[in-house]
Amino acid sequence: MDTVKIDTRDVNFWYGDFHALKGISMQIEEKSVVAFIGPSGCGKSTFLRLFNRMNDLIPATRLEGEIRIDGHNIYAKGVEVDELRKNVGMVFQRPNPFPKSIFENVAYGLRVNGVKDNAFIRQRVEETLKGAALWDEVKDKLKESAYALSGGQQQRLCIARAMAVSPSVLLMDEPASALDPISTAKVEELIHELKKDYTIVIVTHNMQQAARVSDKTAFFYLGEMVEYDDTKKIFTNPEKEATQNYITGRFG
């Protein structure tokens, strides 16, 4: 029996009066990769950001329903949002390194969380840069600015930065859309490696990418989750006509 990592129950979400997500229930298994696909404005990124409460930062939003991670309701009273975001890391569409050295970009989260043991920090920086398949490219220039890295290297640095505080879930919002094909391939290879240790949820407009990297795929349209199934089934034999129309390019 696969362990359920993320469990959402009848999730509805509003921006002001706009009903952005409508009755979404799904389960995401531990150490799997789930892709969210669908046209722009369908709600997939909004849903992703609920998993580490990023939408809390937007005024006049409202959530109904439950989102549980490891069995705990992450919107219950008393939940420490900082602790949640340590456990549920986020990688954004455009690489966003801090104006610091490569080393300090990765060490930042550890320092913010009160880690003062420099030997541990050095070890963790090396471990996560290796985990993000970046160590061999940067090990001799850790003191240089992160801005000196290529876009693809910066994105892998941001993945390492998210990994440094030992999350169990990684959220990726279009992580390769701003990258060239070679850098995109490296990020996709990395996702395959990371699922040994992490539960990964990725939003992508690139359906070929969803087909390559994910175990399951959810298709969103107009704020609803139309279909959620094994990726192979979604792309070869979907049950819903809307899913078929989207993956064959008839709309979107």
From Swiss-Prot:
GO terms for molecular function: ATP binding; ATP hydrolysis activity; ATPase-coupled phosphate ion transmembrane transporter activity. GO terms for cellular component: plasma membrane. ATP binds at residues 38-45. The keyword Transport applies. Residues 6-247 form the ABC transporter domain. It comes from the Bacteria. Its EC number is 7.3.2.1. It is a peripheral membrane protein. Belongs to the ABC transporter superfamily. Phosphate importer (TC 3.A.1.7) family. The complex is composed of two ATP-binding proteins (PstB), two transmembrane proteins (PstC and PstA) and a solute-binding protein (PstS). This is Phosphate import ATP-binding protein PstB. It comes from Bacteroides thetaiotaomicron (strain ATCC 29148 / DSM 2079 / JCM 5827 / CCUG 10774 / NCTC 10582 / VPI-5482 / E50). The lineage of its organism: Bacteria, Pseudomonadati, Bacteroidota, Bacteroidia, Bacteroidales.
